[in-house]
Amino acid sequence: MARTDPSSTGSNGISAFLVDATLDGIRVGDPPKMLGNEGSHACYVWFENCEVPADSIVGGQEGRGLKAALRGINHARLHVAATCVGQAIRLITEMTEYASKREQFGKRIGEFGQIAAMLADSQAEMAAGRALCLDCAKQFDAGDQIPFIDIASAKLFCSEMVSRVADRAVQVMGGLGYMEDLSDVPRLFRDVRLFRIFEGASQVQQGNIARSMMKDLSLIHISEPTRLSA
């Protein structure tokens, strides 16, 4: 994105471009080593006196790039929230299978109260996050103008939830949950850390939610439950 109208302010005058990486003046760096999510690459891109053709404007209309991006951010944040739920299900499955098989002092470790609490809390929090995602998805499918606060709440809760679940999975599985050669849990533990950062960090979501609440008290609501057909 670039401001194509220097006299404009705010989101006005910012245009989005789809740029050919082979143009003169573009330099693409090597992907940096990341903590997790190694299947998703990111890299630095430098633009030095690069001339971008006018027909590279996304949507063909100048000055609407940031507005278009903001319109799509709700979908992106719901996608992240749903991904968090999926990762949580995987982690819960891993630690529950382990707790059901690993025995200490003559019984399965999942029967010990503290381990059982971690399993139960993880399941309950995952189910709550899934309900948030389904409620938002239902509104999207119905073509409703979904409240910004609903998406922000789903993104905030689910990203924080999956981090707690990942931490519990390592704790339940003990040394096995810390050894990459023996379990996928260490990789998942690293991967889910990103969800609290990208598409709006948790602190950004908290600020957005609080501002929305104070601006319009009617946003503090409980959506109608999804009715399943018989």
Regions found by a protein language model. Name each.
Residues 222-230:
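A short, hydrophobic C-terminal helix/tail in secreted or cell-surface proteins
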Residues 11-13, 28-30, 53-61:
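Short, charged, solvent-exposed linker or helix-capping segments at domain edges/interfaces
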Residues 1, 16-18, 42-49, 194:
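Conserved hydrophobic/aromatic beta-strand scaffold that supports enzyme active sites
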Residues 44-46, 60, 64, 71-219, ...:
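Alpha-helical interface subdomain recognition
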Residues 1-28:
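A short core secondary-structure module
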Residues 22-51:
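Flexible, small-/acidic-enriched active-site or ligand-binding loops
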Residues 12, 40-42, 190:
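Short, solvent-exposed loop/turn segments at the edges of secondary structure
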Residues 7-11, 35-39, 61-62:
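Solvent-exposed alpha-helices and their adjacent loops that cap or buttress functional pockets
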